[in-house]
Amino acid sequence: MGSWIPKLLLLQLVLLLTKHADSSSIIKYLPGFEGPLPFELETGYIGVGDEDEDQMFYYFIKSESNPEEDPLLVWLSGGPGCSSFTGLVYENGPLGFKVEAYNGSIPTLVSTTYSWTKVANIIYLDQPVGAGFSYSRNPFADRPSDTGSAKLVNEFVRKWLAKHPDYFSNPFYVTGNSYSGKVIPAIVQEISNGNYICCKPQINLQGYVIGNPVAYYDHDKDSRIPFAHGVALISDELFESLKRSCGGSYSIVDPLNTECLKLIKDYHKCVSGIYQELILKPKCETTSPDCYTYRYLLSIYWANNEIVRRALKVVEGSKGKWERCDLSVRSNQDIKSSIPYHMNNSIKGYRSLVISGDHDMTIPFLGTQAWIRSLNYSITEKWRPWMILDQVAGYTKTYANKMTLATVKGGGHTLEYKPEENSILFKRWISGQPL
């Protein structure tokens, strides 16, 4: 008799989650922000997958300009396992945290000046399932995968548009950075195929934006050593020895190549004190308010507050501790390389913008340039600086496949390190202006 109790409790939990699933709410006030929100925010869930068992949580912010005609973006953070909330409050959204020592109260939110929502509608989507506030109603759900995520995001977007038919005709873009930059080209292909083969509503797909994206991770990592040499983190002698002994491959090394392995250890000793996401920032303890990464703790304090969860309409019991980047979301990384997807999307004529912070050592610009070259498209606009107020903000190059590469001078692994410059860059590109 007693063995039925856990099953009964599990059934009750599933019924509770089912009852509240696939819903949305307009949010006018957020804990930590003074007064009503100066923009339109909706949060909610869309069920995807078998019997809608995967409940994907999103934050939708209407364009503050002309929402009826402005582009519609879905924004995906990296990881895999990072909540899209990290994009909303740290990178390109209309809210950010006031950075101050945590005193036990709800962290303070303030308005930003650089939000992409000035010119675009944005759906910040927690994916894959398990990231952010997304959850599965199936306690035995399969491990998420890159290709599976592409299919589920396609399903999410179609279902979201069915519930928001006013946005059918808006130009649609898939956007994000870091690890999501590997999956985004597959999502674009999935949406494109759906438009051609089977599915309604038709999505007005125009292209994609990716920042410091993973493309072929081993090759991306290989570019760290020449990058480190180029910015004077390792010596000429060590670099030349590494090239000679390792043959340019530093991620996958023959275990019998002891000389290469020893030199790679020497390399790691040289860069162990470097903050790889932006080499100009100090590497320090996140618990110190003086450290840049302390701001990440504020989102954890905020999102784990019960008052905040009620305000966001998070389904009770659906999520334990919220993590900005939940490394326990172990994804099956079955897309080895995104390059074939870029090729297919180019053939179909979709625009793309590749942003690269030039001081990121996680996914260095050298690796990004290398995979773009491998596409073998002719150059339609040669390498040149792009400017803000007569100052060089970065460099750009455009290719015949409608792909634009733009570096951001002094930028890091994500948009947050140069938000104003990234905002100007995006606004010019999305409107079709020259950078």
UniProtKB/Swiss-Prot annotation:
Family as reported in the entry's similarity comment: Belongs to the peptidase S10 family.
Glycosylation site positions: N103, N344, N376
This protein's UniProt keywords: Carboxypeptidase, Disulfide bond, Glycoprotein, Hydrolase, Protease, Secreted, Signal
UniProt-listed Pfam families: Peptidase_S10
GO biological process: proteolysis
Tissue distribution: Expressed in senescent leaves.
EC code(s) of this entry: 3.4.16.-
Disulfide bonding pattern of the chain: C82-C325, C246-C260, C284-C291
PANTHER family: SERINE CARBOXYPEPTIDASE-LIKE 14-RELATED (PTHR11802:SF316), SERINE PROTEASE FAMILY S10 SERINE CARBOXYPEPTIDASE (PTHR11802)
Record keyword Secreted present: yes
Active site location: S178, D360, H413
Subcellular location: Secreted
Recorded superkingdom: Eukaryota
Annotated GO CC locations: extracellular region
InterPro entries: AB_hydrolase_fold, Peptidase_S10
Protein name: Serine carboxypeptidase-like 14
Signal peptide stretch: 1-23
Task of the protein: Probable carboxypeptidase.
Native source organism of the sequence: Arabidopsis thaliana
GO MF, one annotated term: serine-type carboxypeptidase activity
